[in-house]
Design a protein with these regions (language model features):
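Conserved PLP-anchoring active-site segment centered on the Schiff-base-forming lysine
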Residues: 111-133
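Aromatic/hydrophobic pocket-lining residues that form π-stacking "cages" and hydrophobic walls in ligand
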Residues: 19, 23, 129, 189
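Active-site phosphate-binding strand-loop segment of PLP-dependent enzymes
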Residues: 146-199
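A short helix-loop-beta submotif of the ANL/AMP-binding
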Residues: 135-141
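N-terminal small-domain helix-loop-helix segment of the aminotransferase-like
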Residues: 9-99, 107
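Helix C-cap/helix->beta junction micro-motif
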Residues: 26-29, 136, 195-196
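Short beta->alpha connector loops at strand-helix junctions that form conserved
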Residues: 123, 142-146
Length: 199
């Protein structure tokens, strides 16, 4: 019997993880390595966080599965955080807890798009987004972002490059540029999208 290998096996590896693996191999030989490949924290969590985690581990009622979207109390607290910090209160029923942003992106892409859909993303940009899109059968369309435009996506280039994409992925702050999209710029991008789609 031969094991079938899926086509997603041909998706290029996320190079940062390969660099991290190579760096760990060198560390094991005694070499001093400065890790710049992934955004690992350089300091431990605050004592209060470690204490709360330790207490939570002792509560056996919290062990095991939670509801699919995450513990309601946590989702409600996240909604309250948005009210405290940003003055908006998202419906906590629309908040999902994921074990990292990559799974959150995968779930969002699966919910919003179909295989073959085109998603516009800025370049330079975080390479893992392209890998994830390819794994889900989505097609990343690269939008040039340049220093002389404050690394914002060039919407004119997007509009003139062919058929409009089925979606746009915006990251703020962006990796690797660090750009945070200002409210006015985000409103302009949203208005542009609505103008293209809504007529």
């Amino acid at each position: 019997m031969t094991l079938k290998i899926g086509k997603t096996n041909q998706i290029p590896a996320f190079l940062a993880m390969q660099v991290m693996q190579d760096a760990q191999r060198l560390e094991a030989t005694g070499q001093d390595i400065m890790h710049l490949e992934v955004g690992q924290p350089s300091t431990p969590p605050p004592d209060a966080v470690n204490s709360a985690l330790s207490t939570a581990l002792g509560r056996t009622a919290s062990h095991g599965y939670s509801v699919a979207l995450g513990h309601p109390a946590l989702r409600q607290r996240i909604s309250a955080h948005y009210q405290d910090w940003y003055g908006i209160t998202p419906d906590w029923n629309r908040i999902a807890i994921t074990p990292g942003s990559s799974l959150g992106f995968a779930i969002s892409f699966l919910a919003a798009f179909d295989a073959g859909d085109h998603i516009a993303i800025a370049t330079p940009g975080y390479p893992a987004y392209r890998n994830l899109m390819a794994a889900l059968g989505l097609v990343p369309d690269l939008i040039p972002a340049r220093a002389d435009q404050a690394w914002m996506p060039d919407l004119e280039a997007l509009a003139s490059s062919g058929p409009l994409p089925d979606g746009i992925l915006l990251a703020s702050p962006a990796n690797p540029t660090g750009v945070v999209i200002a409210d006015d710029d985000l409103a302009e991008i949203c208005g542009w999208c609505c103008g293209m789609v809504c007529g």
